[in-house]
């Protein structure tokens, strides 16, 4: 209860400061609710991807974590993190997947051999959760 009151008080102060600049924060929040945000896959697993179990970037990652000790370790855990974020962030959003986040069924696939079929489970999951998907090829930390 005290935390909620503190947040409400902080928002009221911020709202007054923005109003002094002619900004209606309630209108801004309503507009923001109509702007899709693309949540990047690497925010939940420190850019490891799912090419190989326990993958890490050569040179390290960015220390982003999800709802698991260290980082999401599986596609299931990363999807759960995406779903939780989607529940907490108002509006309709998208996920952004790099090629290294393919669902390879446990078999290694070279990046130059990845096909759309490697993302079918992601497509089905996103559709069932009302999310769009943006795609990035992965041209770093890999020879091919």
Model-derived regions, located:
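Alpha/beta catalytic barrel-like cores
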Residues: 2-144
